[in-house]
């Protein structure tokens, strides 16, 4: 009698399928959780994004909510902001690169290459960023101005000259 293995292995075929799902949905991103429930103590998530997917800059204020991300394929821009939307740091991450974002740090992501896939780990349970955790200087997903906000994130992430000290200047700034 054959038994399904308990060990899961994910690779190129899985990344390709997840990226295809991301390309087919309006949000232009797709996640796949390895944890059993939203209440799990540790959240382990594969995320696939397309370049036209907008994620509002945000922070996770709960002290246990450090976030670690490993880019598996593609390229991601990562920006660190202060509460007014001034850029404090900028990173461009490629395959095999890891970013650790301490709890309380306002950060924004942007996808810089089609079919980008990354793996994220942080403490559970899941809590969608709300109120002060959502950057007041940037529109929420679905609000007017998100296309301009995404373009600004990409411009800051890919600027030839370091954008440190520049303001986000989105439609809500």
Q: Where do the model's predicted regions map?
A:
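His/acidic/aromatic-lined binding-pocket segments of jelly-roll/cupin-type domains
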Residues: 46-47, 66-71, 99, 109
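Glycine- and acidic-residue-biased ligand/ion/polar-headgroup-sensing regions
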Residues: 50, 64-81
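Short, surface-exposed beta-strand-loop junctions and turns on beta-sheet-rich folds
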Residues: 62-64, 84-86, 125-126
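A short, N-terminal "cap"/entry segment at the start of jelly-roll beta-barrel domains
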Residues: 1-43, 56, 91, 146-173
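Short beta-strand His + acidic residue motifs that chelate non-heme Fe in jelly-roll/DSBH
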Residues: 57, 78-80, 99-101, 107-112, ...
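Double-stranded beta-helix
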Residues: 108-173
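Conserved short histidine dyad/triad with adjacent acidic residue
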Residues: 46-64
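Short acidic-glycine-tyrosine-enriched beta hairpin
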Residues: 82-104
């Amino acid at each position: 009698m054959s038994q399904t293995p308990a060990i899961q292995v994910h690779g190129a075929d899985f990344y390709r399928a997840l990226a295809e799902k991301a390309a087919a949905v309006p949000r232009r991103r797709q996640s796949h959780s390895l944890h059993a429930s939203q209440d799990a103590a540790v959240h382990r998530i594969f995320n696939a994004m397309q370049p036209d997917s907008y994620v509002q800059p945000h922070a996770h204020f709960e002290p246990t909510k450090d976030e670690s991300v490993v880019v598996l394929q593609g390229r991601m821009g990562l920006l660190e902001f202060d509460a007014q939307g001034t850029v404090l740091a900028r990173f461009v991450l490629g395959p095999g690169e890891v970013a650790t974002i301490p709890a309380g740090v306002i950060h924004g992501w942007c996808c810089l290459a089609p079919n980008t896939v990354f793996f994220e780990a942080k403490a559970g349970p899941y809590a969608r960023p709300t109120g002060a955790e959502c950057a007041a200087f940037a529109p929420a997903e679905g609000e007017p101005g998100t296309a301009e906000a995404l373009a600004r994130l990409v411009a800051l992430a890919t600027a030839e000259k370091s954008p440190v000290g520049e303001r986000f200047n989105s439609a809500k700034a």
